[in-house]
Amino acid sequence: MVSYNIGFGAYEDDYSFFMDGGTESWAWSKERLDENLSLIAQTLKDQMADYYFIQEVDTDSTRSYHRNEADILRRALTGYSSVWGQNYDSPFLFWPLTQPHGSSVSGLMTFSSAPIASSLRRSLPIETGVMKLVDLDRCYTVSRVPMENGRELILYAVHLSAYTSDGTIAIKQMEMLLDDMQAEYEKGNYCVCGGDFNKDLLGNSDQVFGISAGDYTWAQPVPAELFSGKNIAKIAPLDQDNPVPSCRNADAPYHSGQYVVTVDGFLVSDNVTVSSATVIDTGFAYSDHNPVTMTFTLQP
């Protein structure tokens, strides 16, 4: 299984984004965007995974030259069932003045090598007031894959909030997601969630990667008490011998000493056995995230 926030194909290693304190609001050019999307698609294909979760996939956005990136990924991952969940539909944003961000339609995707019987989109609680303007229409998708033993593998694709005033909304989002997964587990189903949690999944990324978070407070650890009474576990991808972060701060081009953190990962129910979870080191060449992988088996 692979999860990858592709950053709408714009975040090359020399890219910074205005909403993160950087300068850019569009991909550098149509040509560079297309090249990045091609490399992203090839990276995904190379993993030969059974399941993929992909975030920040634009379908009709000014910032990505109105490329339908969902169609590009579908063509790359032929033979897979796919699900699209829209989590960003923004009218024309006239900022920054030098190159307005424009309008955006974006979402997250799930790909499965086994047929998906049904899927739905569930809205998550989001900020109100001014913060709502910079946050997405947060959601997660729920896709059901029938198993031979009569149970279902429930695939949850998620991208939680980053731009919040005090972190309360992100906690409420996690609570809703975990309650949903727990309910499905109690029915006897297998539950696996993958995506960008915008939380420090390791809990100590600054120590693991040797770079202080400093004033960057957007990626807080996930409170352990959220899992109390739940049969759900957090899986933070990490190779102890060669630790690689899953995300870089996008307030400047990628450079040595830049703040990095692991925010991409997985949640699994107790009847799912995880054998490995790692981060693929792309050097942040075509996204501000690295893809993360997890190998697992379903218990009888």
Language-model features: locations:
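Active-site beta-strand/loop signature of hydrolases that rely on acidic residues for catalysis
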Residues: 1-6, 36-66, 111, 143, ...
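Solvent-exposed loop/turn segments at secondary-structure junctions
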Residues: 6-9, 58-61, 87-91, 116-117, ...
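Metal-dependent phosphoesterases centered on the DNase I-like endonuclease/exonuclease/phosphatase
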Residues: 164-270
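Surface-exposed cleft-lining segments at the edges of enzyme active sites
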Residues: 23-29, 57-59, 124-133, 159-168
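Short hydrophobic/aromatic beta-strand or adjacent loop that forms the aromatic wall/cage
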Residues: 105-108, 136-142, 260-265, 288-293
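Conserved beta strand-loop-helix elements of the APE1-like EEP
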Residues: 75-78, 102-119, 257-273, 297
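N-terminal, active-site-proximal structural segment of metallo-dependent hydrolase catalytic domains
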Residues: 1-76, 84-105, 300
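A well-ordered secondary-structure block
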Residues: 89-153
